[in-house]
UniProtKB/Swiss-Prot annotation:
Protein name per UniProt: Nucleoid-associated protein jhp_0031
MF-aspect GO terms: DNA binding
Subcellular location: Cytoplasm, Nucleoid
Biological role stated in the UniProt entry: Binds to DNA and alters its conformation. May be involved in regulation of gene expression, nucleoid organization and DNA protection.
Keywords in alphabetical order: Cytoplasm, DNA-binding
GO-annotated cellular components: bacterial nucleoid; cytoplasm
Main location class: cytoplasm
Keyword DNA-binding included in the entry's annotation: yes
Record-linked NCBIfam families: DNA_YbaB_EbfC
Organism of derivation: Helicobacter pylori (strain J99 / ATCC 700824)
Leader sequence residues: none
Pfam families: YbaB_DNA_bd (PF02575)
Quaternary data: Homodimer.
Amino acid sequence: MDFSQLGGLSGLLDGVKKEFSQLEEKNKDTIHTSKSGGGMVSVSFNGLGELVDLQIDDSLLEDKEAMQIYLMSALNDGYKAVEENRKNLAFNMLGNFAKL
C-alpha cells in the first residue's frame, strides 16, 4: 500500500468539508415559499428546513377545517421543496467531488 498518497487524501477531504460548509451556509439563506387555498395560507422555509414565516388569511379563522387542510398542504409542499433542494445540492457536491 502506498501511504504517500494519504496526504493528498487529507487535502481532498479538507476541500470537501470546506465546500460542504459553504453550500450549507448558502442553503441557510435560501427561502422556499409554498401557498395553498389560492394564497390563503403561505409558509416559508429556509434551506435547513426551518419554518421562517407563516401567513394565514383572516377569513380562515372562522373555518378550522379548511385552515387545517390548507396548512397541511402548504407545509407538505414546502417540506418537499426543501428536500428537493437538499438532493440537488448533494448531487452537485458529488459532481464537484468527482472532478477533483
